[in-house]
């Protein structure tokens, strides 16, 4: 009995021990399973896989209706949280059967974009806050200039982002491009103005200056202003607009509705080859969705490195308000426009424009010395060669000091660079600078002044390239007609080049997109020496086909003095080869003013012989002509007076050509042939089919000759000092 009882007790203890072991085993397995599940969860999340909720959905397959969860594809900001990202370009397969779960990743919520995700634009605005100005233009006779965006725009076509109108003033924006007071803005901001004022911001407030209009270009919609600042201004840096890509982020800075330093953000939406805006063809505009409103005209379009890549000019709007489509003139076009007048512009230093360091870009060549390193304000000059008597800011940036310790570097605007001087010139200085190397401050010329070529309007244009270059890389006088095929006229070593339009192509028999029309040639220039004539069509330059004046200029930039350039020219239906050489004739042409238009060789038109200087050819006309009329009503134009061209006030070198006169258009009938072609009141017609019309007799003869020919009519027009061609 006792043994039996003992056996029973031993068996009970064994069963209890076995149960405990089983429980421990099951608990261990459960822990392992949880670890495996947790590890799988972490692995899936780290490799861009499904979230836990999606795993539970997969585990519950077949237990309920299928739900397709939309996918939010992440852009650049999707990389902020890689643990919750969705592979770019992932495609979702459709359900294989009714009620099945589609293999679609769940929606990913990235949350708000972090500050500064698109670039350091806040520092860019800080950098440019003193480089963007408000431009106020007052119209003549105290009347407000027209503002078409103030009314509805039912045609839905692009219109200028016109300056906001305040009683008798228009408000726009401008960009300081040089610290000595040069400012670029839009042509339509200051057109028709008799006074212009500029408000410049600084670190302590603002200063209002009276501005002078230096030059304007209607086709580019650009104007260059000049103020006389009390202290050096802060200049912006013009970047490379050709390097900007579609979808690059930009900001627009301006004065919309008079609200100064307003910043909007967007992207480059497109690059437009040609746009007709209010009857004027503009080329290579940058399209952006950054908000541009009335008053933004002339303001900068800026990329993340702080450089200006465009000058805001127009918007596409059905009602006058911003509709998400704006346009800006590329900075590369603005640079050429400015360099034609000022010669040099600031450029970013090695540290980058975003650091606020702006260096002076002197004319290339001549061995101009490099700028010195930054120095602390108040430091004694270590020089003993005369530089100790100079202003240190001529060569150095100054680091200001305060409270006994240096402050961060600040840009110090350098003074205006000294003028170029010929090598071997005797120094006029007596303060020690006569012992210095002149190349430290001056551009050294090889014994001669920089080459300049006169345009057909009589003004001398400076090279934007070194003196040894053949290219006059400038934009010459441009017309405002919409038949300009998107670009304007360029003067090339004495030849005025105009792009082919459909009407001009019909006149010459050359299709649009092939060749460049030569609208005028100045005597005693390389172009005239090569044999070019007005009416020729330039097909090739140095063996390369050309279709725009800018392409010709770009090719010529690569050439150097003394090199012969082969030209392919179409004349009277025959292709001829000519050679253009920059020899003594080219140098001598620098000092030759453009002759009177009546003295220029005229091409044969309509089978007529060329006109001799000072004479008018009248096919079939009597030897003694009757007294001509004094008033004309022709093609919708009323003409009563004849006068000499009047250049824009303040444009250096733009003087009337001696003896040149034209027929002034008093009025243009709406809807007439002249109005459709783009003629306006106060236009001055200089030539009709290459015949000068300096008086009633010549105009009457030219009208009769054009009527008898029965062909399209080619008019040379002067508008506000700019000459261009219109085909009727």
Curated annotation (Swiss-Prot):
Cofactor(s) demanded: heme
Q: Which UniProt keywords apply?
A: Autocatalytic cleavage, Biomineralization, Heme, Hydrolase, Iron, Magnetosome, Membrane, Metal-binding, Protease, Repeat, Transmembrane, Transmembrane helix
Query: Which residues participate in heme 2 binding?
Result: 438, 441-442
Give details on activation and inhibition.
Autoproteolysis is stimulated by exogenous substrates or peptides that bind to its PDZ domains; may be stimulated by an environmental cue in vivo. Protease activity is tightly regulated; increasing its activity decreases substrate levels and disturbs biomineralization.
Q: Name one GO cellular component term.
A: magnetosome membrane
| Enzyme Commission (EC) number | 3.4.21.-
Motif extent (MCR (magnetochrome) 1):
375-398
Q: Which sites are catalytic?
A: 188, 221, 297
Post-translational modification remark = Subject to autocatalytic cleavage; cleavage also requires MamO.
Question: Where found in the cell?
Answer: Magnetosome membrane
Topological category with respect to the lipid bilayer = Single-pass membrane protein
Q: How does it assemble?
A: Might interact with MamB via PDZ1.
Protein name in the entry: Magnetosome formation protease MamE
- Which organism is the protein's source? Paramagnetospirillum magneticum (strain ATCC 700264 / AMB-1)
């Amino acid at each position: 009995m006792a043994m039996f009882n003992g056996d029973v007790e031993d068996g009970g203890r064994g069963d209890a021990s076995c149960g405990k072991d089983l429980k421990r085993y099951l608990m261990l397995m459960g822990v392992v399973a949880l670890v495996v599940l947790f590890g799988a969860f972490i692995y899936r999340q780290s490799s861009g896989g499904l979230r836990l909720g999606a795993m539970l959905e997969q585990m519950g397959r077949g237990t309920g209706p299928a739900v397709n969860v939309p996918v939010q594809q992440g852009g650049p900001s999707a990389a902020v949280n890689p643990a919750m990202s969705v592979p770019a370009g992932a495609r979702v397969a459709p359900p294989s059967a009714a009620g099945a779960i589609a293999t679609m990743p769940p929606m990913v919520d990235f949350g708000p974009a972090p500050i500064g995700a698109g670039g350091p634009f806040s520092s860019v605005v800080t950098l440019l806050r003193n480089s963007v100005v408000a431009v106020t233009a007052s119209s003549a006779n105290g009347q407000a200039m027209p503002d078409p965006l103030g009314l509805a725009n039912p045609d839905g076509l692009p219109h200028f982002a016109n300056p906001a109108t305040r009683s008798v003033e228009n408000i726009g924006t401008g960009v300081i491009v040089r610290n000595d007071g040069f400012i670029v803005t839009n042509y339509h901001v200051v057109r028709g103005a008799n006074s212009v004022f500029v408000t410049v911001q600084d670190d302590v407030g603002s200063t209002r200056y009276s501005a002078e209009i230096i030059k304007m270009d209607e086709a580019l919609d650009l104007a260059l202003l000049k103020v006389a600042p009390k202290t050096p201004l802060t200049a912006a840096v013009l970047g490379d607009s050709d390097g900007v890509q579609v979808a690059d982020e930009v900001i627009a800075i301006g004065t919309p509705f008079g609200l100064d330093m307003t910043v909007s953000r967007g992207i480059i939406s497109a690059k437009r080859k040609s746009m007709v805006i209010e009857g004027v063809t503009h080329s290579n505009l940058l399209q952006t969705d950054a908000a541009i409103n009335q008053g933004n005209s002339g303001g900068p379009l800026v990329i993340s490195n702080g450089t200006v890549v465009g000058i805001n000019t127009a918007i596409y709007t059905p009602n006058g308000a911003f509709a998400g489509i704006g346009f800006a003139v590329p900075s590369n076009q603005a640079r050429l426009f400015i360099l034609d007048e000022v010669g040099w512009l600031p450029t970013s230093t090695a540290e980058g424009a975003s650091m606020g360091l702006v260096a002076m870009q002197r004319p290339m060549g001549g061995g101009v010395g490099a700028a010195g390193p930054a120095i602390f304000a108040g430091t004694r000059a270590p020089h003993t060669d005369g530089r100790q008597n100079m202003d240190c800011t001529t060569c150095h940036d100054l680091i200001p000091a305060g409270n006994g310790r240096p402050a961060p570097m600040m840009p110090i605007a350098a003074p205006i660079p000294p003028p170029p001087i010929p090598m071997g010139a005797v120094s006029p200085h007596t303060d020690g600078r006569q012992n210095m190397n002149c190349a430290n401050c001056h551009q050294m010329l090889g014994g001669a002044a920089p080459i300049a070529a006169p345009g057909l309007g009589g003004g001398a244009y400076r090279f934007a390239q070194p003196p040894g270059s053949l290219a006059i890389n400038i934009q010459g006088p441009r017309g405002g007609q919409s038949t300009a095929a998107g670009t304007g006229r360029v003067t090339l070593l004495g030849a005025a080049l105009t792009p082919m339009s459909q009407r001009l192509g019909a006149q010459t028999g050359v299709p649009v997109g092939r060749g460049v029309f030569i609208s005028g040639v100045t005597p005693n220039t390389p172009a005239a020496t090569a044999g070019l004539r007005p009416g020729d069509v330039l097909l090739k330059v140095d063996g390369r086909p050309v279709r725009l004046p800018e392409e010709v200029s770009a090719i010529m930039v690569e050439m150097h003095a003394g090199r012969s350039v082969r030209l392919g020219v179409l004349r009277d239906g025959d292709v001829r080869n000519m050679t253009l050489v920059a020899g003594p004739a080219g140098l001598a042409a620098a000092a030759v003013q453009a002759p009177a238009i009546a003295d220029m060789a005229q091409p044969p038109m309509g089978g007529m012989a060329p006109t001799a200087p000072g004479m008018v050819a009248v096919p079939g006309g009597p030897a003694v002509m009757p007294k001509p009329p004094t008033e004309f009503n022709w093609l919708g134009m009323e003409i009563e007076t004849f006068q000499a061209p009047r250049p824009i006030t303040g444009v250096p070198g733009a003087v009337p050509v001696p003896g040149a006169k034209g027929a002034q258009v008093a009025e243009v009938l709406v809807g007439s042939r002249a109005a459709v072609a783009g003629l306006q009141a106060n236009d001055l017609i200089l030539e009709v089919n290459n015949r000068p019309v300096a008086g009633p007799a010549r105009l009457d003869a030219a009208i009769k000759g054009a009527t008898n020919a029965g062909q399209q009519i080619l008019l040379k027009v002067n508008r506000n000092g700019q000459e261009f061609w219109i085909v009727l």
